[in-house]
Every structure is written in structure tokens, then in C-alpha cells.
Amino acid sequence: MKTKAIFVIAAAAMVFSLASCEKIGPDEKPDGGDGSTSDTTVVSPGPSAGSDTLSGNVSGVWESGRTIFVDGHIVVPEGKSLTIEEGVTVIFSDAGVGVNHAAVEFSVNGNLYCLGTEEAPVRLTVAEELRTAANTFEGLWGGIVAGATCEEMLIDHTIIEYCGGQVIEGSPAAENGYYTAGDDAYPHITTNNVDGRYVITNSILRNGWSDAIYMMGGNAIIAGNIFSAIGYDGAEAVNVKSGCTVDVTRNIMFSANTNGLKLSSSDQSEVRHQAKIQAYNNTIIGSGWRRDGEKGGGIYVEENADAGVFNNLLVNCKFRATTPAWDEPGSEDCYDGEHSMIDYNYYASGTVESSIVFSGEYEDDGEMLLYSGVKFPYEGYAFNHEWYDAEKVDVHSVMARTAEEAASLDPKFVNFDLNMDPASYAFNDSWDFHLAAGSPALDASKTYTAGDRQPYFGTSGLEVNGQTYTSPAIGAWFGAFGE
């Protein structure tokens, strides 16, 4: 067995790795997964132009360096695979499909392998002239919808952007029962197979109306990614439901509208098992401020989710970890407080007032309530929120609750100033979220490393596309990176 490490230096000179074991032998399928070579779409260089326009069923290989224009829904059929090689740019039409202009959807009923590299990432995007700040939350195309028959998917060194078109009548996701027409918008990535295997790593998911990753089933490693400008009027960077077992680690989550992490076991049943999540060593920045009301803030755990949430570094978030109905154990809305461990996190705050502050009264289901009026992150951490489980959650966490504590607990990023508008969603590629020497967030004595909460896929890993990927080990520091 051949062993290799996958490294990334993304955006702000950030480095991480995932170990993988490449399987060499007669079972390896060089065509990308299903072993067949007939009835496929193989895009190869032509004599004149380095581009192609496609819609409908797609499979085979989109070869390195090509530009693919997509002007209608595309589908990887069940039993087929599509491999997108390094340097491929896929441009989705913003015109939509049909008389109702349904957002273009990338449906994956078979398997998908996006195999970018640090030097030549795969890019799923829109036309260059549409890649503007004004279109950050416009939802110009749909997103990837991995259906119930998608067995595996690898998203590696891939940029996915400007997603989030509305799901309407005629949208494949509505016709297939994954989303509701008129009520939902497309995430960047959706999963639906409780037995599926998904690895999303070294990638950038940005600029979208809805969630970045919405998991309704599957086993996943989500590691080493950058999420930024996620959600127009709601949404999370990573949203996990029942039927999922997931490791979420070493990610940067910047300006998720509501939360960096929403962990729920909603719709749990005999065929959709309890959601199990290990979320550790992530850096979550500026979550919750753009969400109307008091729901957003960074971490949200509900509805019987079994969650390990630890060694995360939350910076300039509106609130700390919230667990609705925490005082009603066993109720439908309460998280699995008996087995979960949401603790040993680090809450840092700048001292700049948010440009978005909700104060005064508001109506919720006919009831008049008061906004928190929180202006600074440290005020939100100190706020007497009804969803703070003071008995079990963040008991050992490090937390800035005053301006003075905010100054003393500055995590000292190599290149990121805490004293910026916490509601900002513009990501700067020069930022570096490594911790400088002497950072209090490097204090290993305050972290969690040796307990029962270990990565689900840290040893056995997940086999995808003939390789076994393992989750990174728990870091003895807070956040995605140490020094």
C-alpha cells in the first residue's frame, strides 16, 4: 500500500494535511469509479478552442485545463462517475433553465471526483464578469446535489462559488424530494445517502445565498477548507442532520450568516440514525451578526445531536455555543446532553462595535420579545441567553466577557486584526490564521486531547476513489492552526 500526504496552502498561507493510502491493484478503476468506459462524456482538447458547452447526463473525465460551459442541468447518472481534473473551470449559466429560469443544478446520482491541486484548483463558478461583490449573495446558479444513490464524492482543492439559486417548481431538487419548491435555496453542496462516503478537503466554498454544506446523510470528513460569505438571510457553513457521521476539523469559517456549525439530528428514524459529529480545531469568525434575531452566533446544537465540539477558536461571533431546550432533556428540541461534549473552546473578541445591531422589540409567532441589543462580541459571550447551557456547555472554555478580557485574550493571529467590524463578510486573501508565538490560544493545558471524543475517521478512515482518507489528529491548541 502506498502512502501519501495531501497538503494545501490556501488563501492566507495556511497549511494543513490529510493522510491517504492509495490502493494499487486489480480493483483500481482508472476511469474514475464505476469501471465502465461506455456511454460517457470524455472531454479532451480540441483543435481550436479549449472549451465545451454541456447539459444533460455527464460522466467520464473532464481533462486538465479545460473550460466547461454548463447551460442546463447536468446529471451524473446512477452507476456512473465523473472525474474533473486539475485546472478545469466549470462556468454555470446564470440564465437558468426553462421559462421559469430554474437555477442550474449539478445533480450527482453516481459518483463525483473533483481533483484539483494547490497550483491548479478545480473551479465551479459563473462567468468572470459576474464574479463581483454585488453578486456575493445573488445565488446565480444552484449547487451540487448528491442524491440518494451517490455512493461517494471527493471535493479536493476545489473552489465553489456564487451558489444558492432558489429551488422552484421544475427544479430537479424539488422533483426528487430533496428540497421544497418556494421554501429553499441551494447550498453549495448537499448530501442525501446515509451510506455515502464524502471527503471535502482543501477547498474554498464562498459567496452563496444558502448553506455551504448541507448534509442529510452520509459519512464525511470535512477538513482544511475555507468558508466565507455564507448565507444571505440565514444559513450555516456546515449544517448536519440525522443519518450523518462527520468529522469537521481544521476549517476556517468566516462570516456565516447564522452559525459556523449547525448540528441537529432532525428527522431521525429507523433508517436515519442519530447525527454524530466531532467538530474540533476549527476557527469560526464573525458568525451571527447578519442574522435577524437571536439565533445565530457560531455553534448551534439541537434535536438529539450527539456532538463533540471542542478546541475551536471563535472570534468576533455574536454569541457562544447555543443549545435550545437544553433544560428539557429528552424533548424533541434538546440536544443529546448525556453523550455530547461542547466544551474546551476559546472565545476571542475585538472591541469594535458591529455595524449591524438588533435592539428593541420584535414579534416571534405572535409573541413580543426583546432583542439582545448586543453590540460587541464580548457582550454576546456574557449575555444571559436562554439557550446557554451553563451546566454542561463551555464550562472549561476560555472566554472574553469584557473589553479588558478581550484585550488579554487576543489569540495573536499572524495576520488578522480582531478590531474590525464583526459583521463584515469580505474575505482578505492575505490573512493568516496561524497563531504567533506566545498566543494564549496555544496553551495546551486548556485544550481537550486525551478523552473519549476522538475523530470518527481518524484511524479507519474513509475510502473514496480508491484511497483511504483519515481525519487529522486533534491539535493541542485552539483553532484550525497552531504556530
Report each predicted region and the residues it spans.
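Positively charged n-region of N-terminal signal peptides that target proteins for export
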Residues: 1-7, 22
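C-terminal motif of bacterial Sec signal peptides marking the signal peptidase cleavage site
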Residues: 17-20
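Extracellular beta-rich repeat passengers
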Residues: 25-85, 93-110, 116-117, 121-483
